[in-house]
Curated annotation (Swiss-Prot):
It is a multi-pass membrane protein. The chain crosses the membrane at residues 56-76, 98-118, 162-182. This is Cytochrome bc1 complex Rieske iron-sulfur subunit. Belongs to the Rieske iron-sulfur protein family. It comes from Corynebacterium glutamicum (strain ATCC 13032 / DSM 20300 / JCM 1318 / BCRC 11384 / CCUG 27702 / LMG 3730 / NBRC 12168 / NCIMB 10025 / NRRL B-2784 / 534). Binds 1 [2Fe-2S] cluster per subunit.
Length: 408
């Protein structure tokens, strides 16, 4: 506030002033000059004012509808995964778009209402203030309160109860649209799910489908053929099966060319349905799809050129994790969990397209660029007696981005 006015006002003098006088005094003390001020609707009961109020009300009501729609979608809409051909696939597909549409409608409508109210009801005003320094005095504190009261009165919000109520309700709902998604985090990541370990792990951050190796389960590196299943019904109920080839098939080393990469998923021996063991009636499609959709299951199988493989720097304690020129790294970026789905064969770098982290495949998946701070976990692999690539063990560190309980 300004210290240019030498007059010291007593409490009695300040109490004797009206709110308008205090507001005017506040502008003078603050070296503010109101160069221009015009009321939007100087005539009482102006039809244009009523139209403007209805327009603001419309956007506020629309914002409330959007907020309620978001909460209803988030709480009641069927969000569980549905595979191709499942009943309810359309509703599942629309879940995320509905969240975006309703939350966007809520926030944008409230924004439109605020902008419209300012343009239609707040008086046009041009004020000029000279810059000055100095601590605030008692008179300044009193006058700023008066200025705020004056702003409240001139905004006419005090007599527009409907707009105030709608704005308050809309603001609360807009806040809920931001807070409600955090409900998805209200889950203890260390509580195992009911039932035994399966192809998606036990539900904790420590496990994946590859953890089955620790339970003496033979786990193959399964290539995704992207085969689409068809529904058929028999005496035991509805089943899904592919024709000619299953969704996941085992891989041999010769199936991958040098300087190339393949995304593989855990394929337990009991789910194998290819080669000499192929049985068109074997019902494994849904189980294999659970493996494909496992949040920590995706692994990049990389076959290096022989010349490049000779340059590899092994991580201490993981010297035997590879099989010849074949290296298997987790496909989950250690930054925030995006899929590191790009592989540059010429530079042997693994790229995450989300935030441009880069990992050196010749240096145990060490990050060399971008925000990722930890190397990609490496899966130990080998071949079995039939020549198929299998997991020789489980990952020795948690997969994906960091979390509080990690020590590194």
């Amino acid at each position: 506030m300004s210290n240019n006015n030498d007059k010291q006002y007593t409490t009695q003098e300040l109490n004797a002033m009206s709110n308008e006088d205090l507001a005017r005094l506040g502008t003078e003390l603050d070296d503010v000059t109101i160069a221009y001020r015009k009321e939007r609707f100087p005539i009482a009961n102006d039809p244009a004012e009523k139209r403007a109020a209805r327009a603001v009300t419309f956007w506020l009501v629309l914002g409330i509808i959007g907020g309620l729609g978001f909460l209803a979608t988030y709480i009641f809409w069927p969000w569980e995964y549905k595979a191709h051909g499942d009943e309810g696939l359309l509703a599942y597909t629309l879940y995320t778009p509905m969240l975006g549409i309703t939350s966007g409608l809520c926030i944008l409508s409230l924004g439109f209402a605020v902008v419209l109210y300012v343009k239609k009801f707040i008086p046009e005003e041009i004020a000029v203030q000279r810059r000055h320094d100095g601590p605030s005095e008692e008179v300044d504190r009193r006058t700023i309160v008066a200025l705020l009261n004056d702003s409240w009165q001139t905004s006419t919000l005090g007599r527009r109860k409907l707009i105030m109520g709608l704005a308050g309700g809309g603001a609360v709902l807009a806040g809920l649209t931001i807070i409600a998604p955090m409900g998805g985090m209200i889950k203890n990541p260390w509580n195992p799910k009911e039932g035994p370990m399966d192809v998606q792990g036990d539900g904790t951050l420590w496990t994946s489908g590859w953890t089955l190796v620790e339970n003496d389960v033979k786990v193959y590196l399964g290539r995704d053929t992207a085969a689409i299943a068809e529904s058929h019904t028999d005496a035991t109920g509805e089943h899904w099966s592919t024709t000619g080839v299953s969704r996941l098939v085992r891989m041999r080393p010769e199936d991958l060319a040098a300087a190339s990469m393949e995304t593989v998923f855990p394929l337990p021996a009991e789910m194998v349905n290819d080669g000499a063991e192929y049985d068109p009636a074997k019902d494994v499609y849904e189980h294999q799809m659970h493996s494909v959709h496992g949040p920590r299951n995706a692994v990049m199988l990389i076959r290096l050129r022989t010349a490049d493989a000779e340059k590899v720097i092994e991580r201490e304690g993981q010297e035997s994790f590879h099989y010849g020129d074949y290296y298997a790294y987790s496909k989950i970026c250690t930054h925030i969990g995006c899929p590191t789905s790009l592989y540059e064969a010429q530079t042997n770098r693994i790229l995450c397209p989300c935030h441009q982290s880069q990992f050196d495949a010749l240096h145990y998946g060490k990050p060399v660029f971008g925000p990722a701070a930890r190397a990609l976990p490496q899966l130990p692999i080998t071949v079995d007696e039939e020549g198929y690539l299998i997991a020789a063990g489980n990952f020795i560190e948690p997969l994906g981005p960091a979390f509080w309980e990690r020590k590194s």
